[in-house]
């Protein structure tokens, strides 16, 4: 009887916090690992759990564990806590969740985070067909093989995209285990470094050493799209700007030539008007020469008064008398 009560009490202590967590109404926290969730053996890693400002304790829960794996008080910011793993080993590999508690109760569990340890086994070999340098739209295949009979292989793209593919291993007589990853219609998003790992089914978070790296370079096809690329648009804009500038320069040059021609014509017309005025105001000297000249002829004079106009700036005028001489012979007079 005492033993039964002890068992029931033990189960109550275990189930009570889990029931409170499951029934929690506080927002669930966020969990992540630094420097990442795939950690080489014997290196340190920090697991972070970020929740509410009212949190009093943060609990880290590992899958297949009965009690919280670790409990930490919040940092000075009070909205998160960190859990240190000084040296990564197989015992730390697994799936983790976190939650927090406050005066209002327990929060929900965070999303699951898989913490993987690499380096437990020898590395597999990675190859690519037909080439690591292909054009966009081509299908390629990665082959990951190992002398160790792994249960599965995983292909990982390192970098910002962080894509991964997992396949069950296949077996042949001369090749104990391998997996072929086919990527259909690759795009520039697949550019990057690829590695593969092997692991056993019963320990999915304990991987082998990383394979050799392969750098994949995907280039655009020449006729991939009828729309201009960014470089094409930039070139088109430069050409358009150049044409517009040329038209503006021609327009201003033509306008300048028109103004010059107009000023030249106006000046020429003004000069002609001045000459005509001077011709009308000046007296003309008319002479008449008879056909038969006689040294003894009589000279007649015809006087025509006129006024010489000087510059308009001068107000005084002078009278000038012009004489027109007419020479006639005596013989003409007698007649």
From Swiss-Prot:
Superkingdom of origin organism: Eukaryota
Biological role: Inhibitory receptor involved in the down-regulation of the immune response. Receptor for FN1. Receptor for integrin ITGAV/ITGB3. Inhibits IgE-mediated mast cell activation, at least in part through interaction with ITGAV/ITGB3. Also inhibits KITLG/SCF-mediated mast cell activation. Through interaction with ITGAV/ITGB3, inhibits antibody production by memory and marginal zone B cells, probably by suppressing their differentiation into plasma cells. Inhibits IFNG production by CD8 T cells, CD4 T cells and natural killer cells.
Cytoplasmic side: 261-335
Glycosylation sites: 133, 191
Topological domain ranges for the Extracellular compartment: 24-238
Assembly and oligomerization: Interacts (when tyrosine phosphorylated) with SH2 domain-containing phosphatases PTPN6/SHP-1 and PTPN11/SHP-2; interaction with PTPN6 enhances inhibition of mast cell activation.
Swiss-Prot/TrEMBL domain comment: Contains 2 copies of a cytoplasmic motif that is referred to as the immunoreceptor tyrosine-based inhibitor motif (ITIM). This motif is involved in modulation of cellular responses. The phosphorylated ITIM motif can bind the SH2 domain of several SH2-containing phosphatases.
Protein modification: Tyrosine phosphorylated.
Cystine pairs: 49-98, 144-196
Residues spanned by motif ITIM motif 2: 320-325
Key word Oxidoreductase present: no
Intracellular or extracellular location(s): Cell membrane
Annotated protein name in UniProt: Leukocyte immunoglobulin-like receptor subfamily B member 4A
GO biological process, one term: negative regulation of natural killer cell activation
Transmembrane segments: 239-260
Gene behind this protein: Lilrb4a
Reported induction: Induced by lipopolysaccharide on neutrophils (at protein level). Induced by IL6 and LIF.
Free-text tissue specificity from the UniProt record: Expressed on mast cells and natural killer cells (at protein level). Expressed on neutrophils (at protein level). Expressed on eosinophils (at protein level). Expressed on dendritic cells (at protein level). Expressed on memory and marginal zone B cells (at protein level). Expressed on CD8 T cells (at protein level). Expressed in the uterus of pregnant mice where it is detected at day 4.0 of pregnancy with levels dropping at day 4.5. Highly expressed in the luminal epithelium of uterine endometrium with lower levels in the glandular epithelium.
Species per Swiss-Prot/TrEMBL record: Mus musculus
Outcome of mutating residue 322 to F: Partially suppresses inhibition of mast cell activation. Abolishes inhibition of mast cell activation
Alphabetized InterPro entries for the sequence: Ig-like_dom (IPR007110), Ig-like_dom_sf (IPR036179), Ig-like_fold (IPR013783), Ig-like_Receptors_ImmuneReg (IPR050412)
Summary of the knockout phenotype: No effect on fertility or litter size. Normal development of mast cells and natural killer cells. Increased severity of local and systemic anaphylactic reactions. Significantly increased sensitivity to IgE-dependent passive cutaneous anaphylaxis with greater tissue swelling and mast cell degranulation, and significantly greater and faster death rate in active systemic anaphylaxis. However, another study found no effect on mast cell activity with no increase in mast cell degranulation.
Xref: Pfam families: Ig_2
Gene Ontology cellular component annotations, sorted alphabetically: cell surface; external side of plasma membrane
Record membrane topology: Single-pass type I membrane protein
Motif (ITIM motif 1): 298-303
């Amino acid at each position: 009887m005492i033993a039964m009560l002890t068992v029931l009490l033990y189960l109550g202590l275990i189930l009570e916090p889990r029931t409170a967590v499951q029934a929690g109404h506080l927002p669930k926290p966020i969990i992540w690992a630094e420097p990442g969730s795939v950690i080489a053996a014997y290196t340190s890693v920090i697991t972070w759990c970020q929740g509410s400002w009212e949190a009093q304790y943060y609990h880290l829960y590992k899958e297949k564990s009965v009690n919280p794996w670790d409990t930490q008080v919040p940092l000075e910011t009070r909205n998160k806590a960190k859990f240190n793993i000084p040296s990564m080993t197989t015992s730390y590999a697994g799936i983790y969740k976190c939650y927090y508690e406050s005066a209002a109760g327990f929060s929900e569990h965070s999303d699951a985070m898989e913490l993987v340890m690499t380096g437990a086994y020898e590395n597999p070999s990675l190859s690519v067909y037909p080439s690591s340098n292909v054009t966009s739209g081509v299908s390629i295949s990665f082959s990951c093989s190992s002398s160790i009979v792994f249960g599965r292989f995983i292909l990982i793209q390192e970098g910002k995209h962080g894509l991964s593919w997992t396949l069950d291993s296949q077996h042949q007589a001369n090749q104990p285990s391998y997996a072929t990853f086919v990527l259909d219609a690759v795009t520039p998003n697949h550019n990057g470094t690829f590695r593969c790992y092997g692991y056993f089914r019963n320990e999915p978070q304990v991987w082998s050493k990383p394979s050799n790296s392969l750098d994949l370079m995907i280039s655009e096809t020449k006729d991939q799209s009828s729309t201009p690329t960014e470089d094409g648009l930039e070139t088109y804009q430069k050409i358009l700007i150049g044409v517009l500038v040329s038209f503006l320069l021609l327009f201003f040059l033509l306008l300048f030539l028109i103004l010059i021609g107009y000023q030249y014509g106006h000046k020429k017309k003004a000069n002609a008007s001045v000459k005509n005025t001077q011709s009308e105001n000046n007296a003309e000297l008319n002479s008449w020469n008879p056909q038969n000249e006689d040294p003894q002829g009589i000279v007649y004079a015809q006087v025509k008064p006129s006024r010489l106009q000087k510059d308009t700036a001068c107000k005084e005028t002078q009278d000038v008398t012009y004489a027109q001489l007419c020479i006639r012979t005596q013989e003409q007079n007698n007649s």
